[in-house]
Amino acid sequence: MIRSFYGAREGSLKTERFGYVAGGYRQVVCALAARLAGQGVELRSGHPVTVVGREASAMTIVTRAESVHCDRVILTCAAPLVAALCPDLGADERQALRRLRYQGIVCASLLLTRPLGGAYMTYITDENIPFTTVIEMSTLVGRERFGGLHLAYLPKYVPADDPVFEQDDAAVSAAFRAGLTRMFPDLQASDVVALRVTRSRHVLAVPTLHYQAQMPAMATGVPGLFVVNSAQIVNAALSVNDTIRLADASAGRLLAATAR
């Protein structure tokens, strides 16, 4: 994380250089989807995949509504999900995927009538506070983009098996509100206009001792099935830049491998 922020600095004096995408990354995703669709790519959202397997000479993707047959499948989901989706993988391969440790996140997004501490990012070391950082987006973007309100994020980074993932939104919201009031005693309930909780169990794989030996390979034991995910990012932070580098490198390797 420190390397990531230091790398975002500019010049020999390493002055701060920080930017944002107006409208959030949704704008980037929508623009990418439109460009792909314009090139003839068929995009299907809202089709949860239940099984990926091989039948005869083709790969099969099973959803709740249909089965799709194709030549090759590239899975970009987290390693434990790959193991769960692909019963044709060997037992050792599935176990290796399940063994990878992941860090997840639970995050509260708040709209407030007032600022909090005034800094863009405040790291928290007090174990009595139920989140690990206060990110005040309005210090970077400006409150005019939020109708005069202030946008803040309260992320909590936890292991993928942390009990917080079993708590409902109301419980997480109550705990985070209490923690925020502990940090900012003058904060009133009426200052919080809206609060929304989001969560993801598998955000990034945790590099452990001899991690590169455990890192999942792109090609699997199932012909036509490939894996490209964040567990293959090493010696770098899980940033947009590093993710794009992985995608570019993997695309080149896949095209070369499938052209043979």
Predicted regions and their residues:
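Short FAD-binding loop at a beta-strand-to-alpha-helix junction that anchors the flavin cofactor
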Residues: 151-155, 218-236, 242, 246
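Internal hydrophobic alpha-helix adjacent to the cofactor/substrate pocket in enzyme cavities
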Residues: 243-260
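Active-site/ligand-binding neighborhood in enzyme catalytic cores
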Residues: 1-51
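A short small-residue
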Residues: 9-13, 153-160, 228-229
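General small-molecule cofactor/ligand-binding pocket signal
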Residues: 42-44, 193-196, 226
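Mid-domain catalytic core of redox enzymes
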Residues: 45-166, 170, 174-187, 198, ...
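Generic structural signal for well-ordered, non-membrane alpha-helical segments
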Residues: 21, 25, 29, 169, ...
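Charged, often glycine-rich, active-site loop that binds/positions anionic groups
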Residues: 202-214
